[in-house]
C-alpha cells in the first residue's frame, strides 16, 4: 500500500473523491493507487505531491 499517500490525504482531511478532483482523476483510481492495484505513475505522483507540497518520490516510500 502507498501508506504515505494515505497518511497525507487523511492528515489533510481529504477524501479520495476530493483528491481525485484536485488532480483530475476519479475516486476509483485514487483507491487503486492507494491499494497498489495499479502502479502510481510518476506524472500523477508529481500532481499529488504539488497538492501536499512534498517531494513526489516520497509518495513511494
Predicted regions and their residues:
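Key DNA-contacting residues within the recognition helix of helix-turn-helix
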Residues: 6, 31-32, 60
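DNA major-groove recognition helix of helix-turn-helix/homeodomain DNA-binding modules
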Residues: 43-58
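The alpha-helix within a helix-turn-helix
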Residues: 9, 20, 49
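Residues within the helices of the helix-turn-helix
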Residues: 6, 17, 46
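Short, Lys/Arg-enriched C-terminal cap helix and immediately downstream tail that follows
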Residues: 8, 42-43
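A short, Lys/Arg-rich alpha-helix, primarily the initiator
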Residues: 1-11
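Short alpha-helical DNA-recognition segment
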Residues: 13-32
Amino acid at each position: 500500500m502507498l501508506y504515505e499517500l494515505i497518511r497525507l490525504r487523511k492528515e489533510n482531511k481529504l477524501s479520495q473523491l476530493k483528491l481525485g478532483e484536485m488532480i483530475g482523476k476519479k475516486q476509483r483510481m485514487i483507491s487503486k493507487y492507494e491499494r497498489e492495484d495499479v502502479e502510481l505513475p510518476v506524472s500523477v505522483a508529481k500532481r499529488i505531491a504539488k497538492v501536499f507540497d512534498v517531494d513526489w518520490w516520497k509518495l513511494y516510500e
